[in-house]
């Protein structure tokens, strides 16, 4: 073959190889404008192709179809007919209602209807010839089961998975149109989509296309009236709360505020409702200024004489008039604060944002969010009391399971949920569950937010682990607790996995830390024991929790994800330089490649914090190669401008876990309260610590005590003393003998096994200690002067 032909052939093979390595193969250049938007060669080179349906294990030839998989073919056909009528090339369906909360009423489960995924988090995107769902790690396994093979599963955050706008740019032409309902997408998200999709058009469509096609089997809207949360539970009148809010607005640069989050309306006015299952809220909006206080709610929800008396001084308007009346309300304001997305709070919808005159818009987190998170004394003590009652109910059910399951009495996942509802209802001022119980036996426990159904309901046996995550709503507080149990003889692997999770749980729970510590920075403490074994879990470690409110309450979120700090990369060099002690913890850390640098700082400081000490500099910095001594971007330090600091009487969860797909799941979750602590050091009032709120024993048979540190053992034993004092006394008061006996058996002190006696007497041991001590001193002298 001539040399020139050989070179041409090699060049062709090389180009084909590059095409196959790029993200989406050859680029179709259909219009002159397409040339302006071609991704650069560098952007496309060596990028993984986007996921496809054929890559899903459950969609391969011969795969078993899960019993809970939903057939969406007819629904997609109907939706695409509507898309054609409105000249829409892609339609985005979120999980939200008009208030952008995490949980929505069944009537608003539009995303679940179109795709079949029943988890609380996810976004569906439908084009004329494809459909994809983005969801987070809590729902990867669940989505694989529930999504039929019309759907591409986009595992958000995983390598090679594009975000929504990147995928749409990949599959659409620049002259096509993407649409969504502007009342169901938060402003921050809408603006990001609009910017990232350009030049593809992203337009609001007020006709909701899912509503058009969802004509049968749609759950009705709740009609139950709202009710008052009286002062003995709320601890502060709504009038005083409004006064505090009005005083805060000028500090935020505004003289008016839109409130769209349901839990913020409920908290501010001391009212509750039943419009969202497990969340005591009613559908409502508010507008607040120095002279205006307007509540938009269904008249039937607030029409009782008692409610009308309670709301004296509040202007009341129909719920569905909110967006239409906003322009008139805002006329007298110079600047209107519109809530932005913040942690678990979705912020105001784009429709609400758009209704405020452009020159008067101030988009930032709602000040009500921060006010609500700081529990007053009555709320804080109510939370403690609610968790005490809840512990009695939960222990009662667990003790019954421990008694009956080994005897062969049938218990399945749905029965556990039903029994928990029944036993919690026996406690004072209980108002049902705070979320749908997660009761997963064996492989079901590995589905992080598993929800048992008639199709998946498993009988609980004695060979695998049982994960139980549940909570209750009470007038005096909201609870959330997870314990992992075993009703037989666990394997060594199960014990090791459980103990690793427990170690992380304990290390976070017993932390002492400066008051300026950012919440996300303590996450690594809970994960470190798992990291050391090459393990991790795909969810946050902790979340804020409301007072007779939301199970996930902003602003507290203990999780590794952040948009500010930098992740570590291979061959980064940085310093590890805490003061006051020998810093082994950080140096021996094993951690995921996505870990943010600042998140490991607390490992180096924790031993000092425990003694009321600290050092006033960063723990580590990047270092150059024959260059800068302080090299960007690596900086290991507690300071940050994004996450939130803890405040006294914040309540949040501590819930590390481990999930072995197809085998079992482990999670241990307790609620902690932030309280001050003092030391006789140069930093006397610098520190917070956590107070245990959840008072439920750990599973003794799953704990390998030899893996625990002395500090961890001491913490568990002190915790068990508290559990006996508080919960044991309440059980005695309520005559719950079975639960009490189980509680006592589970809270015996943890003790290390006695060492095996090899026949060496105490006297001989003392002799040998003396010999080794003298030998060490002699060696030290020799080496020192050698």
Predicted features and spans:
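C-terminal GPI-anchoring signal of eukaryotic secretory precursors
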Residues: 754-774
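Extended boundary segments
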Residues: 68-75, 79-84, 399-429, 505-537, ...
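Cleavable N-terminal signal peptides of Sec/SRP-targeted secreted and luminal proteins
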Residues: 5-24, 770-782
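Intrinsically disordered, low-complexity, positively charged segments
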Residues: 73-112
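Conserved mixed alpha/beta core segments that line enzyme active sites in large multi-domain catalysts
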Residues: 98-114, 121, 228-284, 438, ...
